[in-house]
């Protein structure tokens, strides 16, 4: 449930910022020590019967007269975010996992001893109450508290004023605080969960079986990326954190599971940027007797449904621009995309490898680098596309017909030499998905692996290894198959209007804290 951005939903002002935080912590530790002396400082016998958001929704139109005539008994707990002490009566705004609700606490109802203790409780404390719903004179739904308890003492003060965590890195580093004080952050991760649940549901509806494949690989494969390396002590062997599950999922296709998918983590020992995190979530799926055209239709439908399920609409706003996922996605070849956004390039120039190498140098591309060892015309066109068109693909666009030399696992085109039946989906200038008709010719796959090994020997750290067991699996025969990977984190960025991938990962990787 999305939390309202109301005044009461704002994080509370903690102790005055002029007071030293260490002094506040010391004072709270003294309070905790006193609680320990009294017996049970962290009681664990309270069981809520209601949550704040459900009460707000169910009784939003209920008048005070109705609540008096048919009392609603509730037991609710949460973190105290606001506190107003006024003599014999006080108010506290309490936040649970769903939202916020106000407690009305009077000395006559809870007793003099409990009320006196409450006045010394701090913002951030976890408290519980039993009582009845009522409306204040201002019409706010509240709990008339009859029983009040302190369940967990907060030792650290919440961020001051109404700004939450002002430092962006601190939001990532101390996500637990960010979640406490920011309803926007909580809504982002609820939307993430809704999107993933949507994907799972629609995959099941389409007859896919969810599976789990290894995270530790004896040979890294399934993508062009640099792996994290570890060591298995019991087996005394080097292992690699998986960069992609692809080759294991296709082994399952060989084994007879004709539709499989997996949502899990991949690990790539590469740079960190607003679009990249070394540990990230992907959904990969494979369907026998399909091809890349079927995959494009299916992927488009999946993403559209995920948007509707997570945000309620396929028409979104991303970074102050409209993003319409309801319309058919565009489909362009690499050269068509180049000429759409850089029309100065002629067909003849795009077919001239020498011209392209010279042109790429103007963009600062080192065409003598190891990854250009076997670079043909298609690779040079692809790099020019990345320099001129990729970032401008705001509307959902499938770029199709990738060159063989950069698509070692994709099926070659039957009609166009040097091209594979592969696509990448771009939205707002970011790659969201990558899919293709799978190469199921064991001998062709072995030849492509050998070429990848040549590139690795020449210094290309992202080139693939030769996976002999995968070749053996293909030799048993794999049916015609289509496979696709969708970047969950980047998809959630779109659905939540988040500019940085760290905004949609609960605990993103950061430099070590000094």
UniProtKB/Swiss-Prot annotation:
Reactions catalysed: tRNA(Lys) + L-lysine + ATP = L-lysyl-tRNA(Lys) + AMP + diphosphate
Keywords from the named record: Aminoacyl-tRNA synthetase, ATP-binding, Cytoplasm, Ligase, Magnesium, Metal-binding, Nucleotide-binding, Protein biosynthesis
Alphabetized PROSITE patterns for the sequence: AA_TRNA_LIGASE_II
Transmembrane segments: none
Biological process according to GO: lysyl-tRNA aminoacylation
Annotated positions binding Mg(2+) 2: 431
Major location (coarse): cytoplasm
NCBIfam families in the cross-refs: lysS_bact, PRK00484.1
Protein name: Lysine--tRNA ligase
Gene name per UniProt: lysS
